[in-house]
Structure formats: structure tokens, C-alpha cells
Amino acid sequence: MKNCPKKSAYPKIGIMKRPHVLLTLFVIFISLTSYSQFRKYSNEFLNIGAGARGLSMGGAQVASVQDGTSGYWNPAGLVGVKNNPELNLMHAEYFAGIGKYDFASIAFPTTNNKRTFAITGLRFAVDDIMNTLFLVEPDGSINYNNIQAFSSADYAFIFSLAQKLKESGNKNIHLGVNAKVIHRSVGKFAKAWGFGLDAGIQIYQGKWKFGIAGRDITTTFNTWSFTFTEKEKEILYLTNNEIPVKSSELTAPRLVVGVARDFKISKKVNLLAEANVDLTFDGKRNTLISADPVSADPKLGLECNINNIFYVRAGINNFQKALADGDTLNIKKVWIYQPSAGAGFKISNVTIDYAFTNLANQSNPLFTHVFSLKLDMVGDKNKKKK
């Protein structure tokens, strides 16, 4: 870290006039921190996604997203929320209802539509986990009445600000930043608090759209604390379990680069194609391009827009190697991927989106149905104008 640029150099750079400088600074930072020790899968609930539109397009959203879900995908896209506040809601259940995932966001554009503020909330929880610490009585007998249930829940609260840097007839540049607070709890036993920053930029030129999102750009940290009664500590000690006191974990920076293009199919039909690449800097991962310290995970998405009323979407992501089915020797590996599809329907100021996603390999899939709602909160004056 001795070779990091001095802080005094930052104010001299015209960031508002040169958005690409943000990317340069971020790349320098992650190259210097990539050799630090991070937990590779820290805060994984933040990688599930937000909104059925994004999930049905395989998570390829960084370049094209322009609604209230941008606080999750790329905060720069929040400038697409104009004139009225926008509310987004989503609920999904995973693994036969064991895991429940909720997303909510509300975005507020300023009167001149140059800035947008947004608040986003995420929750992933698993309920009714059995606590069997006291299942066995001191005399060795089993007492099922001693089993108690608890929940494990992860929360994230994201505060976003987006601003238009440049708007002309052929080129638009938007910038956005996130500050996120993370809270995680495992029953009454463990709790964690964390904080992190994200930043993103979008550049629209003609039919082309470019996006870059830096997540956890300063490294996101979680600090854990643990609480056990004396009786619980005794049971843990007698069963040769370690009794944790305090711990902390860091989430390494992640860079998502995206490019999208609009295609005019007919007078009422448009096609949007987008490709994203997730770049991680915490060592070798099981991805399409796997290296140390940088791994790359591509995502592809398509959206067919019919008269701005009906939408059909498809996507593919999560390319990785897995053991082949039927290989009893566990030697042969094959490439698998995660497909997704979905649709959307817009009526006036209400949009309902649906996603059908696959959570496992093709031979033994686990499918999830996801619905989300987008509401443009049009005021009475605007309704009368319409």
C-alpha cells in the first residue's frame, strides 16, 4: 500500500469533466489491494440480483438499467427516473421456500431531473433453523422438547445519488454513488455490522450504451460479535466446538463492465442486447475465465420491447465447470450455465415483471419464479396533464 497515490492528488483532477479518471483510480486501487486477504464469498446475498427484469436478463444490467433498481445494479442509471418518484418491490423464494429474498427501493428525482436520490433495502432470510445444542440431556437421554428454532437474516440498506454530467443530442454521461450499511444476524448468537461504497458510470452514445460499476470499491467490512450463555458455552466446549469471540471480514472490490445496443426491428418492436463481465480480484474462481488474482464471469441478456407495453426477455450467466452426471469416479468435468427468461407488462404507470430462473445445472435444475412491481408515483397534476 506504500505505492498508493496521495490523497492530495485527487482534487487536482477534473473528475466532473473526465469521468474515465474514476475507472483509472479504481483499477490502480484494486491492483494494489488484490493481494490482501479477503473472504471470497463474503456478503453473497448482495449478488442475487434485484428486479425480475434484471434476473430474467441474466443479470446483464450495468449498461442499460434506467429505473429504481439501478441502486443495486449501477447507481448511475437512477437518472432514468424522471419527473415522479418510483417504487420497486420484489419477492422471491429459493430452495422450496427455505430462503426468502425481498427487495424494495424508492427513488426521488429533483425538479430539474438532473439528480436522483434513492433508498434501497435488501433482505435474505432462512427461518426455522433447528438449535439442537440441548437435544441431549446430561444423563445421555434425548429430549426433543429442548429443540428451539431461530432465524438467520441478512440486511442491506443502500443510499444512492446519481447525477447527469453531460447531456447532448448524441452523448449522455451519468455518474452515481452508493453508501451501503449491512446488518447480519444469526439468531441471538451472532450479529454483524458493515459498511461499503459503490460507484458507477453510464455513457450513452447513439444506439450504444456503456456502463461500469465498481462494487465495494473501498472494500466492504463486516464486524461480527457473538453472544452465548454460560450453559451454551459449556455445551460447545464439551462437544469440542470453538467458542468465537469477535471476528471481521472484508469483501474485495468487484468491477462490472457492460455494453448494450438498441436495434430497431420494426416501427413498434425494438431489441436490446447487453453483455456484462464481472471482474473479481480475490483469487481464482470457478468462472469462464479463471486466473489469479483476476477472474471474469460473463453475462448475456436480451429484451424485446413491443410498443413499450409488452416485454420478452432472456439471459444466460454463471458459466462454470462441474462434475459430469453419472461419473462415479468424479473425474470428468463439464461446462454448465444458468439460463433465465421472463416477461413484462406495462399499464399506465404500473409495470409488472416476471422472471423464470434456473439455480442449478441443466440435468437437475431448481427453478425459481420471481415477480416484481414497478410503480411510477404520478401526482394529481401530472395525471390531469395526461
Protein language model regions, located:
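Cleavable N-terminal export/targeting peptides
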Residues: M1-S42, V378-K386
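Subset of outer-membrane beta-barrel
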Residues: Q37-K386
